[in-house]
Amino acid sequence: MQEKLKNDKLKIGKYEFDSRFILGSGKYSLELIKSAIEEAKAQIITLALRRANTGEIANILDYIPKNITLLPNTSGARNAEEALRIARLSRELGCGELIKIEVISDSRYLLPDNYETIKACELLAKEGFTPLPYMHADLYAARAMRDAGAAAIMPLAAPIGSNKGLCAKEFIQILLNEIDLPIIVDAGIGSPSQACEAMQMGVSAVMVNTAIAEAKDIALMARAFSLAVNAGRAAFLAGLASVSEAKASSPLTGFLRD
């Protein structure tokens, strides 16, 4: 049992990780980032890279332990070309080739633009990046992103920052059935139980930001999510019992006599 869990690695392109919990950094005070990372036992942390905030980015990097893998995102990009420019900036800042593609042109619902994201995957892959596209769970778009060079697919569970949970559960399940890439649930997860449910489905990892950043005790909530992700993964590997009609767990005959 322990060996099975020990050998269970998250593989993204050429990278391997022991933790399947990815931590967002968008809403934390700088002082709390390090403690959240430690309690989450995360090995990957996302990082916004808008050109207007380069000074702030340098400060954030000072608070992230050196052994943590950075997953910069293209937050602020409204099209594929802007995503490429932000990705290039991230590489210039020394953040490596892993990049989370975020292309959002809708300021009301903040839904990712799948069409521009497909284009961004192709552009970034051609320049040697390892793209992880954030997307609205759609099979055709996911296939196109895979074919364009995506190393993993990051469908939203619910609108970003909403904490509504697995609203897109059925569509995420289709991606799990049909896409032979890591599926990382991103956006909308609001509680540890929801993260656990996602992992039980068989997703490769879960990314959480708002639900931890807005908790009363950020470090403790980060730990709660870490435990939930691990529990959900273990349940998936163990094999969940099928859902069915009522079945007696003990014999109902032969124990009462007239």
Curated annotation (Swiss-Prot):
Pathway: Cofactor biosynthesis; thiamine diphosphate biosynthesis
GO molecular function term, any single one: thiazole synthase activity
InterPro entries: Aldolase_TIM, Thiazole_synthase_ThiG, ThiG
Catalytic activity: [ThiS sulfur-carrier protein]-C-terminal-Gly-aminoethanethioate + 2-iminoacetate + 1-deoxy-D-xylulose 5-phosphate = [ThiS sulfur-carrier protein]-C-terminal Gly-Gly + 2-[(2R,5Z)-2-carboxy-4-methylthiazol-5(2H)-ylidene]ethyl phosphate + 2 H2O + H(+)
Domain of life: Bacteria
Keyword Kinase appears in the UniProt entry: no
Keyword entries, A-Z: Cytoplasm, Schiff base, Thiamine biosynthesis, Transferase
Active-site residues, record numbering mapped to chain: 100
Gene3D superfamilies, alphabetized: Aldolase class I
UniProt cross-references to CDD domains, sorted A to Z: ThiG
First-listed, main subcellular location of the protein, grouped into a coarse class: cytoplasm
EC id: 2.8.1.10
Biological processes per GO annotation: thiamine diphosphate biosynthetic process
Residues reported to bind 1-deoxy-D-xylulose 5-phosphate: 161, 187-188, 209-210
EC primary class: transferase
Cellular component GO terms held in the UniProt record: cytoplasm
Entry-linked Pfam families: ThiG
Location of the protein in the cell: Cytoplasm
Function in brief: Catalyzes the rearrangement of 1-deoxy-D-xylulose 5-phosphate (DXP) to produce the thiazole phosphate moiety of thiamine. Sulfur is provided by the thiocarboxylate moiety of the carrier protein ThiS. In vitro, sulfur can be provided by H(2)S.
Subunit note: Homotetramer. Forms heterodimers with either ThiH or ThiS.
UniProt family annotation: Belongs to the ThiG family.
Name of the molecule in the record: Thiazole synthase
Species lineage: Bacteria, Pseudomonadati, Campylobacterota, Epsilonproteobacteria, Campylobacterales
